[in-house]
């Protein structure tokens, strides 16, 4: 709720138009069709229960639906690539060729709607020349690999 209020303040102070979802205090959620009647609808989390039922993607199947995942996809699983949304969306924007290939292999529509666009929060690491942290010709430093989420067997 604090974030919602902060966003309202930010946009209002700068006189930037925005659509207020008005979801607090038991208010009925805004009817997107009546308020802005969009031609294209973007989702970052097209899952049931994330949005108000009025904003579910199933209510907009007559519009161009787009999906840009909220998180970096790392799991090769039908659950990630073969939901109803994945198969009916007009465009699915994925971070890399690996994710595109997973969609081609796992989705019923064979990933025909996938476009590889990169992942903005990690794009800054592309083509960056970093110093060679592991190079130590004199073997003067010990190295420790800290990987608490992985098992080395």
How would you label these PLM feature ranges?
Residues 120-153:
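Conserved catalytic-core segment of nucleotide-activated headgroup transferases in glycan assembly
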Residues 1-126:
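Active-site and donor-binding regions of nucleotide-sugar-utilizing enzymes
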